[in-house]
């Protein structure tokens, strides 16, 4: 499992650029690609911004955490995302990562605050750094 932390990319164009870069890294082209999206409570406007770029991405699943999960789910569905691809998580823990198929890339976007920091703490505890 590869985890790409783009939580700190504070605007949609930076997130899109990082997405394009990781698509050009061969070992990150895995069988399963998960978008992990974290929203913070004071950034409701990011739901629309992120949904616009997500609709153009290729993914197998979208995991929603943090604030505005249902709003984000509805916005994504209205933009053509299949609702079966969207998973709402109240929290992510080490067991969630342990249950992931090995040939998976998780691309974490949105905001680092709140749930994002919790997820980073888990990844740092159970993972190893390949690229900085």
Model regions and ranges:
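ATP-dependent carboxylate-amine ligase
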Residues: 1-132
């Amino acid at each position: 499992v590869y985890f790409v932390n783009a939580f700190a990319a504070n605007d949609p164009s930076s997130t899109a650029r990082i997405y394009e870069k990781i698509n050009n890294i061969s070992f990150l082209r895995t069988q399963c690609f998960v978008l992990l999206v974290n929203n913070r409570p004071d950034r409701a406007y990011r739901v629309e911004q992120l949904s616009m770029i997500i609709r153009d991405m290729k993914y197998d699943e979208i995991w929603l955490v943090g604030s505005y999960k249902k709003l984000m789910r509805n916005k994504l569905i209205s933009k053509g995302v299949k609702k079966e691809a969207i998973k709402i998580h109240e929290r992510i823990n080490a067991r969630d990562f342990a249950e992931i198929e090995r040939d998976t890339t998780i691309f974490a976007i949105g905001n680092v605050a709140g749930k994002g920091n919790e997820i980073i703490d888990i990844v740092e505890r159970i993972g190893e750094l390949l690229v900085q």
